[in-house]
Amino acid sequence: MDALEQYIHDHTEPEEELLHELDRETNLRTVAPRMLSGHIQGRLLEMFVRMVRPRRVLEIGTFTGYSALSMAAGLDNGAELHTVEVDDELEEVAQSYFDRSPYGGRIRLHIGSALDIAPALGGRFDLVFIDGDKREYPDYYRMLMGDRGTEPLVGSGS
């Protein structure tokens, strides 16, 4: 661990037990555990959410749910996070951790293509975290900005 990484770890709150369990299960049960956001990225996402105070969040790419749980922890009461995962084999793991979390009621898990699901959710999002299929990033951007002949899914300044 280099000096910067050590500094970050020394000045970051400890990982919550539920997230630690999810990290371990992800490493044991998935073929690509490196896709997990992890503790430091999760804390950073939570901080962004606390700073922005969004009412509606869209996450593209749930994986096993670590980043969704992290962001949900930063949401104000009454705010919601919609997370979209294309791989239906990950649904059970993610949903089981959402169900166990005190913030799980803020999370709505959708299985399928974000390009189909996100526009169908209606309304605009105040914050979007894209961590899905990297090849589809240009399509996600066009969808969010309304460049596909649809209404934009993000407001000005989002």
Model-identified regions with their sequence ranges:
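N-terminal auxiliary segments of SAM/dcSAM-dependent transferases
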Residues: M1-L19, R24, R29-T30
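A short glycine/serine-rich beta->alpha loop
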Residues: T30-M35, R56-V57
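S-adenosylmethionine/decaboxylated-SAM
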Residues: H39-S158
